[in-house]
């Protein structure tokens, strides 16, 4: 699926109403402040990933109009017209019908690499989890919903831990969610590793990617691992009043041989 035309109305500092895209590689050229990144942000928004920065900063700067519109024509397996309007609320449409961002991501899959993505190697595990979440949301439309459900359960677990409540029922409810998310992330990492292996010239050095289960990794089966790891960390979890096992603590281990990629790659190689 490729974008043939992108139309913008009242979007930041961009005055061009229609931007046409050709097949293959497209380059945006212009002076600093011309709106190159803003143009990419409009695509990022339209394709279901939200703004790159503050949502309140999207409307044209200095304009009295508070509503912003972005639409696009897409071609590939099918023809699709996507539209998003942002103001007091956000409305997303696919071929004229209201839809959700996960639906948009399944219609026109996309992945953006930004300067901040260097934190994929140097940053915290939360940054790498975010990358995995974006990748998995592209592969499985149901992923985002399952992730929201699990995060809600984690918040509930924190409350129960602080209150000294019974965790049995909640642990049972979280088990299939944790198992499913772990399985999805592991499959995504395996697919990414396979793709990188097929393109050896893409990277400066061979890298090995490993999905690391948060607070777990005792047994291979994700469901069994959930229960064994939960049992092993039960007392510590009670003491610190924080959930210690689950996808919310996952990481992506990136290595070059026996060394961390963050420590052995130069800044240029990391890019």
What are these regions (language model features)?
Residues 119-205, 213-214:
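An accessory alpha-helical subdomain
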Residues 47-127, 136-143, 191-201, 222-223, ...:
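Nucleotide-state sensing region of NTPase/ATPase domains
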Residues 10, 42, 114-116:
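A secondary-structure boundary/capping signal
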